[in-house]
Amino acid sequence: MLTHSSATDILTLSPAKGLRGQVSIPGDKSISHRALMLGSLAEGETTIQGLLLGEDPRSTAACFRALGADISELNSECVRIRGVGLGQLQEPADVLDAGNSGTTLRLMLGILAGQAGRFFAVTGDRSLRSRPMGRVVEPLRQMGASIWGRAGGTLAPLAVQGGSLKGIHYRSPVASAQVKSCLLLAGLLAEGTTQVTEPALSRDHSERMLRAFGANIQVDPETKTVAVVGGSRLVGQRVQVPGDISSAAFWLVAVSIVPESELLLRDVGLNPTRTGALRVLQEMGADIQIENLREMAGEPLGDLRVRSARLRGCTIAGDLIPTLIDEIPVLAVAAAFAEGITVIRDAAELRVKESDRLSAMAQELSRMGAQVAEYPDGLEIKGGIPLHGAEVDSHEDHRIAMSLMVAALGAQGSTLLRGADCARISYPDFIPTLQRLTASPLES
């Protein structure tokens, strides 16, 4: 049984008896953002198929429309963009609002910094205004950017005076695709070469897409360094967005923990910088098979067939973390149902996401009966202890909300989840799909 009150935003879930069928995974959020941005910066027309229709990409589209790009109505079939050219964004008449999207705000700062002679003000919702922006503002300032805001320019709202930039070699203290992508985008309009070296490889969607649009990009996997040469001309492209493996991960865990389940997840992006969760779940004993492996628009994808399985604990740390950072909340759910102990370390980044995801998962899984110890940079979860239904909260974080829905499917008794609607940020159809798979009537 699954009931949802839209008036109070409370979702009530009961244990599932088996999940069977097929699921089409929504478009990859990271790729959707980048396609909208590069299409807006390119000359000519860009078409995007399979765009994620969540709230975050809508925020990106709204910002770039305000900056002068001609973007058609968003849909998953085909979005058309008539770009303005790399350095030709217009000065908007109002504040640019990134909503809840850290990707929108951080990457946009890199783009706006080099728009010489124009002034921009950017902000976001309450959650985004509390998230750290210094990690991109500091290196942008080293390139010559003029950015001001609260707490020394480390918190939104922020003001940007576009100007001339110079390439730098930035050694990032953390493996962050957002930091890397922000600086590469700034480097498109900078004098000389901009290089970013990371301690571990982060997701590489920006590099792949920038190259496809015509940017002069070099990647050195051995030194974990990416370089872009300023002055490139971007040309509109056809972009096919694969399914988001971060969204697929909820179903991979749900099927693994609910007995007598089998799902086929179609057209899932399998970029090797994003498949850490897949590898970890297989190490834990999950029954996951990759079918119909192929490549589309420079991105590998395939179908995933997953069946119920007995899971065992493992260690998740080190260079694995950047490849599964968004999936850690639902991997914590898998750990609670696995035999033995699972240790998650090197994930302090999760404390400054839409919520403090480490604290949120420790708190909410504990309410359901899990034994969870919290570290400054991770969690230790003693699995194999049956979870029970409880009142839990999403912390207004889409990934926490969906992770707790998955946990409820395998728990004993009913679970009441407050703040379920935020799942729409990255997966608008998650609750309706869950309703279909559990054959539950949805009541508002």
Swiss-Prot record:
**Which GO CC annotations does the UniProt entry carry?**
cytoplasm
Positions bound to 3-phosphoshikimate: 29-30, 34, 176, 178, 326, 353
Pfam families assigned to the protein according to its UniProt record, in alphabetical order: EPSP_synthase
EC number, UniProt record? 2.5.1.19
Q: Which residues form the active site?
A: 326
Gene Ontology molecular function, alphabetical: 3-phosphoshikimate 1-carboxyvinyltransferase activity
Q: Which family would the database say this protein is a member of?
A: Belongs to the EPSP synthase family.
Report the protein name in the record. Answer: 3-phosphoshikimate 1-carboxyvinyltransferase
Q: Which gene encodes it?
A: aroA
